[in-house]
Amino acid sequence: MKRIFISLTALVLALCMCIGLCAGAYADGTAPVAENLELQTYQNVSVGGSLSAYDPDGGALEYTITTEPVKGSIKLENDGSFVYTPRENKKGRDYFGYKAADADGNLSQEATVIIKIEKPKKDVLYSDMRGRADEYSAVLLSEKNIFTGEQIGGEYCFGPDKNVSRGEFLSMCMLISGKPLLESAMKTGFADDENIPSWMKGYVSTAAMCGVAGGGEYGEAFEAQTPVTKSEAALMLDRAINVTTVSYIPLDEALDADIAQACANLSACGVMDDAIGRNGEYLTRGEMARMLSAAIKLTENR
């Protein structure tokens, strides 16, 4: 009986030690989980993205490229954002691998980022967008016949820091929406109709009829030539592509209710960062390209 008692005691102690060790390992946290990604770009066109991983402890993560791409190069920033640039005239599929590490040095399994490099239909490459994260977005707008920048001295320039007018942005939103245009429209119904270019009136009239377009600062005038603000752009795009209304994202009470809802809707489907809508600054072409390229992908995948 004594031997049995000693054996049982030893067993209990062993179990306690195991439980203690397990509890300690759990308290120290577990390895992050890195996500696989897929991207598209065109030959000789850079594309940006962000590495993503989940840390069970909610701590900060560091990212490391563990497998280099074959057909291009990667520039990785500390926050996980990156720019992939394909080598000259390369096409097809490429990939690279990465791992995420937490503050304790725990490493995730290797995740992969797959890049599909396609041949463009047009010969449009922007000299002022080379190597930028939003170069692909700018070229995509031209490929889809939404917007093409200026050609100066035989080279295309996108002008990523230029402002976008209300009329230009609304017209692009309507093109992406796929709504039939009132091409024969001669009047838009806005007080400043005479200031709206003739080529734009079909877009503005259709948008007004569909509830996409509203007046500018003074309501009755559309103000087509006025630069569009980021919050106005969010509202126009949300209405144009009929994004699902979400209720699980808290609305910013500092914004008008319809703008706050538009920002939440577009944020939920990855079209824009909802923080953009809180900014009263004017929308730039670079920001426009990122928003509209995401909207194109969203509408095409419906």
Listing of model-derived features with the role each one plays in the protein:
Residues 66-79, 150:
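Low-complexity "stalk/linker" and mucin-like segments enriched in Ser/Thr/Pro/Ala/Gly
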Residues 56-59, 68-70:
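Short glycine/proline-centered coil/turn motifs in the loop regions
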